[in-house]
Amino acid sequence: MYSEIQRGRADIGGLMARPEYREWNPELIKPKKLLNPVKASRSHQELHRELLMNHRRGLGVDSKPELQRVLEHRRRNQLIKKKKEELEAKRLQCPFEQELLRRQQRLNQLEKPPEKEEDHAPEFIKVRENLRRIATLTSEEREL
């Protein structure tokens, strides 16, 4: 079986073009295959070995890249800091500011119900009010 493969390769070698630079000038510098700097580095080899071992053991590598995990971690930390600052700001408010906020909220609540009543008013009342406004505008224009 192995010998058949070797014979097949020998036949293919005869079909492939051989470089001509070897034959016509022996003084030329012959090219060498360049080393891949990534694969040549020790850290890359160790990383590759670790990934292979994890794959063999069935340990899944996190689906997210490291950069994305770091960014999510930073966002979470920023949100936590922001919430802490808001809570701290609420605690540090003096009683006077708290009372002002309560009064402002009460005023807002008192102003909202009249708007709701206008929304529920029948359409003919709204049209009548619009006609009154138009009538007053036209009378003012006539005076000018």
Swiss-Prot record:
One GO cellular-component annotation of the UniProt record comes to: nucleus
Annotated localization: Nucleus; Cytoplasm, Cytoskeleton, Stress fiber; Cell junction, Focal adhesion; Cell projection, Ruffle membrane
User: Which Pfam families does the protein's record reference?
Assistant: DUF1151
UniProt feature coiled coil, ranges? 67-94
What positions carry the motif Nuclear localization signal?
Answer: 74-84
Renumbered to this chain, region (Disordered) spans 105-124
The residue ranges flagged as biased composition, category Basic and acidic residues, are 112-124
Record's keyword terms, sorted: Actin-binding, Cell cycle, Cell junction, Cell membrane, Cell projection, Coiled coil, Cytoplasm, Cytoskeleton, Growth regulation, Membrane, Nucleus, Stress response, Synapse
Which processes are annotated in GO (biological process)?
actin filament bundle assembly; actin filament polymerization; regulation of actin cytoskeleton organization
SUBUNIT field: Interacts with ACTB. Interacts with COMMD1; this interaction stabilizes COMMD1 in the nucleus. Interacts with MAP1A. Interacts with PRDX1. Interacts with F-actin.
What is stated as this protein's family in its record? Answer: Belongs to the FAM107 family.
Identification of the protein by name: Actin-associated protein FAM107A
Source organism:
Pan troglodytes (Chimpanzee)
